[in-house]
């Protein structure tokens, strides 16, 4: 059974619609979806003419032109400094958004923004800081993970500053050679002062996304240990219930799929992280290659998450935008409560990855 068989209908043609309108809020003004659908769902190479055309449209249509129009000549947005504030118009958030929307890493404006961030947002411990004057007490997993994921997408994998932040991220998770503070990341295993010193699953998802974006053969031993710690933590609860340690009750944000997520997370993101690690194609919580290959619905901890994701599709195989930052960014992205190309893309990536995990396990068991 292919991943499309799990859908009530095939939304791929909808995702592949060409950019026909630039009307604010129009789902047709999000050319990044077409680019990513061609690349990630149809497996088209980067030099494919349609892929190249779709990627070029990203820089001229939709949210990215509005973001770049607001950039100051020195490379920052709104005001000089580390760029965390104001949410969600400061420098930090634009770099994250540019990467998520598919900005061209070679664009001079994008490079200028990345360089400004790297030169003004890193604390003495090597991590990114949320404070206007970057100090170690402002280093938190959600921020560091989001920015590392963005910078890797934007071509900075070999930059020593990025590699230092990766090392901090991994060591802050495992507790190796890290001096924790009362503010910010306050202990190993994703402990965060914003969560009353408890492990933060939102931060865990962001940190894990950043670490698993590093190719396996390029991960350091401490990165691999951190990934194992993160997987164990995320699998310690049912992602569909999301009753991870929290300040009060479980946040309803977990159950509302959105784009972009910023520092928030949802069930779909947790599932995406675990499936990317190879969990989900077998009958246990062991990653790909260690078990029998029976199917995601039988996997403890992931079965409910998978069914929850599928239950949210409509009759056309689309997912709604339930969580949004519209009105707070330089440009709105789709409309809340309406079918979302971005959220649908997120869901389909997970479904396709599950099929890849299953296929790999079937091949290894032969």
Regions found by a protein language model. Name each.
Residues 1-366:
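Preference for long, amphipathic alpha-helical scaffolds in soluble/luminal domains
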